[in-house]
């Protein structure tokens, strides 16, 4: 098991280093000049001002030297200074990251609450109309893009086109310390938008795993002994079927971080993803690199932990 964990940790480190390299290259290949962006001019800029600012930002150094400085800084926890916000990148990310993690965490809880019981129920009702409805809904849930679902929720629940008598807030953020009620009210729509697609994936995996467990010899033997169906399901089938489901939940937790990029911008939720889009528009190299690095690190770390957990639960994969 020790060697298995070391392999997974080593793979994660290599992947993270590869991501850092690719991100640096792609950011510096972006069209547009951050210096001209900061000076606020694209035509006839003052050459002296341009060169002075370029030197100040370190953009006049050879590209390999810039890369080496960024890697060394990142290893020391220093991702540089944001061009647009004039503060350390880590400080800017530190303000936004908890909001993104909160959104992803709440969405995952909702996805599990929706997906797990529906998956078990769908397996129990296999071949019936209710199973067809649930599997069709799951297929739709996995195929509808996050931003489309977000705008549909805004139209239905914020514009109140069906005259429910209330309108949900469609954008913005309220600090929980100032108004907890308003905070959670503004969290509902983006969290459900993220949750539904994940819930559909969890439901399909749960259904598949439960069906496989139901067809096993051990379950048939328990039924032959006269055990009631709900006891067979709750005490034996669910426990055996949930190892691949736990893996799916862990993998989807990593995917949620990517899903927040669209969701946060649809609902104007001030998390890490909206900061990333803002930094791209500003050609803020250090902030772009920092945001992508942190999001990638979360994704890679989550996948590594899921693999290790799966290895603990199922020794065959070690």
For each predicted feature, which ranges?
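An internal, D/E-rich "acidic patch" concept
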Residues: 59-116
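Hydrophobic aliphatic residues
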Residues: 30, 38, 42, 74-75, ...
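Membrane-water interface segments at the C-terminal ends of transmembrane alpha-helices
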Residues: 23-29, 58, 72, 136-169, ...
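Alpha-helical transmembrane segments of integral membrane proteins
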Residues: 2-3, 97-130, 146, 175-318
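N-terminal signal-anchor/signal peptide hydrophobic helix marking the start
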Residues: 6-12
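Hydrophobic alpha-helical transmembrane segments of membrane transport/permease proteins
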Residues: 16-68, 162-183
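Transmembrane alpha-helical core residues of multi-pass small-molecule transporters
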Residues: 11, 19, 42-43, 110-111, ...
């Amino acid at each position: 098991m020790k060697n298995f964990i070391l392999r997974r940790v080593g793979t994660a480190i290599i992947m993270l280093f590869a991501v850092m390299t690719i991100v640096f290259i792609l950011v510096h290949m972006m069209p547009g000049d951050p210096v001209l962006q900061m000076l606020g001019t694209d035509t006839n800029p003052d050459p002296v001002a341009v060169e002075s600012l370029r030197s100040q930002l370190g953009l006049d150094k050879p590209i390999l030297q810039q890369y080496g400085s960024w890697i060394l800084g990142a290893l020391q926890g220093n991702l540089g200074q944001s061009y647009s916000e004039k503060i350390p990148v880590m400080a800017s990310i530190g303000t936004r990251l908890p909001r993104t993690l909160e959104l992803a965490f709440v969405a995952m809880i909702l996805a599990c609450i929706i997906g797990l019981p529906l998956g078990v129920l769908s397996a129990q009702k296999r071949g019936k109309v209710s199973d067809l409805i649930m599997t069709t809904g799951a297929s739709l849930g996995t195929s509808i893009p996050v931003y489309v679902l977000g705008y549909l929720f805004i139209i239905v629940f914020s514009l109140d086109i069906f005259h429910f008598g209330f309108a949900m807030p469609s954008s913005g953020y309220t600090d929980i310390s100032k108004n907890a009620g308003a905070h959670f009210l503004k969290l509902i729509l983006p969290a459900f938008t993220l949750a539904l697609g994940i819930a559909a994936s969890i439901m399909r995996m749960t259904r598949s795993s439960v069906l496989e467990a139901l067809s096993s010899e051990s379950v048939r033997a328990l039924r032959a002994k006269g055990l009631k169906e709900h006891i067979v399901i709750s005490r034996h089938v669910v426990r055996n079927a949930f190892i691949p489901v736990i893996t799916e939940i862990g993998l989807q937790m990593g995917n949620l971080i990517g899903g927040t990029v669209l969701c946060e911008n649809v609902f104007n939720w001030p998390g890490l993803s909206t900061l990333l889009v803002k930094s791209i528009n500003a050609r803020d190299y250090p902030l772009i690199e920092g945001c992508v690095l942190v999001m990638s690190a979360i994704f890679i770390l989550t996948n590594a932990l899921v693999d290790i957990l799966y290895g603990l639960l199922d020794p065959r994969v070690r």
